[in-house]
Design a protein with these regions (language model features):
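Catalytic adenosine-cofactor/nucleotide-binding cores of aminoacyl-tRNA synthetases and other
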Residues: 1-131, 213-245
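Basic, alpha-helical terminal appendages of large translation-related enzymes
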Residues: 104-245
Length: 245
């Protein structure tokens, strides 16, 4: 069974993620590596990518401390991964796209010119994400009903997103999502925004994932919407509001 309690074998890990992500896990936690669990896979995939992205910007001493130097015997490959594993998982989840073509449709629209041919490592990651979603995410997917206050916030978010100009950046979208969340019960009085106003608590972003996607958490919502498409996100909110009406 693929339940949480059972460890994975190395072969199973490699059904869901690259050998490099497994090497990173082993490198970081040599003692823990005797027990592999599925829920640490996404973080290790994305952390590996971050270490790789950062490598060329580091000086010699920092490079020696970077796990990718050890994983690749001092010769890490060039990094170019336009999306994260966590984002791919959320795309599969939101679109129920259990095929690579649909996912590549989103990626190609978001980053024109990026194809399975130009980015074979990303193509492999798309396959891993579909396997991971099928075995670990889909079986536990549960949409929760929004409260009345959350419904009102979702309606406002839907309206604000539909006003955005085409081609809005992930940053622009994230700002809109943040602005709409700046209300009770999501205000965070401790974490102030740049302008000194109350910040927005994680509960707001978690609610979006729980209600819209049936999962506990996800990547930055603005980044997700930028790849998924604003119109698709608006339809997704409409679906959630209709489901809970």
């Amino acid at each position: 069974s693929k339940s949480k309690g059972n460890g994975l074998t190395i072969d199973e890990w490699l059904r869901y993620a690259s050998p490099e992500s497994l090497s990173l896990f082993m490198y970081r936690e040599p003692k823990a590596a005797k027990r592999l669990y599925f829920d640490v896979i996404p973080r290790n995939v994305d952390d590996y990518q971050q270490f790789l992205d950062g490598f060329t910007r580091q000086d010699g001493k920092q490079q020696l401390a970077n796990p990718v130097w050890h994983i690749h015997s001092g010769q890490p490959p060039k990094a170019d991964m336009p999306v994260t594993f966590q984002l791919l998982l959320t795309l599969v989840s939101s679109s129920n796209a259990e095929n690579a073509e649909t996912l590549w449709g989103f990626i190609g629209r978001y980053r024109p010119g990026v194809t399975p041919q130009t980015h074979p490592k990303l193509d492999a990651m798309v396959g891993y994400a579909i396997n991971y979603y099928r075995d670990f995410v889909a079986p536990t997917k549960q949409f929760r009903e929004p409260t009345d206050g959350e419904r009102a916030a979702l309606q406002d978010l839907r309206d604000a997103l539909s006003q955005l100009p085409a081609g809005s950046s992930a940053e622009d979208i994230q700002n809109v999502v943040y602005e709409i969340g700046r209300r009770e019960p999501f205000l965070d009085q401790v974490k102030k925004g740049k302008d000194g106003r109350p910040g927005v608590s994680l509960d707001w972003f978690n609610m979006l994932y729980q209600v819209l996607l049936g999962q506990e958490k996800g990547p930055r919502f603005g980044s997700f919407v930028a790849v998924y498409g604003v119109a698709n996100a608006v339809s997704m909110i409409d679906g959630a509001l209709a489901r809970s009406a």
